[in-house]
Regions:
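Conserved structural position within tetratricopeptide repeats
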Residues: 13-16, 47-50, 81-84, 115-118, ...
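Register position in tetratricopeptide repeats
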Residues: 34-35, 68, 102-103, 129, ...
């Protein structure tokens, strides 16, 4: 059994015992998203958020699913809500910056990536994201600086 199937089986066992277990719904949603089952991921994130409308992790997880589906408006709305609940959530801040980058709002993307770096300077993927924006707008020296810093952190961050 691969690790996703094993994780899915575990979450299903928990949810069979308690279908209102928010962390298990969000966890299963992450597995669904990782395996490309976006509709199932959204259904589980939606249910988790129905049960706990203040769960910033579930809201940011749904936002990330929307981002991967190129549902930019929905992703931004969810990232905004997650950040409102947890203003120091570097993952949500960086995710929102990725959406801004995707829709060409580079100033907001740079501000978001910088804020995420300030919140957690150990996330190589955020440095690499800001580096990509710098590259896109022709600020090559700053891009190289961020890429170099990201490479230095890469061993500890598989998403870089």
């Amino acid at each position: 059994m691969d690790e996703y199937a094993e994780a899915l089986a575990g979450f299903n066992r928990v949810l069979a015992l308690n279908p209102a277990q928010v962390w298990a719904l969000a966890g299963r949603a992450v597995v669904y998203r990782a395996t490309g089952r976006y509709a199932d991921a959204l259904a589980d994130f939606n249910r988790a958020i129905e049960l706990d409308s203040g769960d910033a992790v579930a809201i940011a997880g749904r936002a990330e699913t929307h981002r991967l589906m190129d549902h930019h408006a929905e992703a931004l709305a969810d990232f905004d809500r997650a950040i409102e609940i947890d203003p120091s959530n570097a993952w949500a801040i960086g995710g929102r910056a990725q959406v801004y980058q995707a829709i060409g709002r580079y100033e907001e993307a740079l501000a978001g990536f910088t804020r995420a770096i300030d919140a957690d300077p150990t996330q190589a993927w955020v440095l690499a994201g800001r580096g990509r924006v710098y590259k896109e707008i022709g600020m090559y020296d700053k891009a190289i600086e961020d890429f170099t810093r990201a490479i230095g952190l890469e061993d500890s961050d598989p998403y870089a």
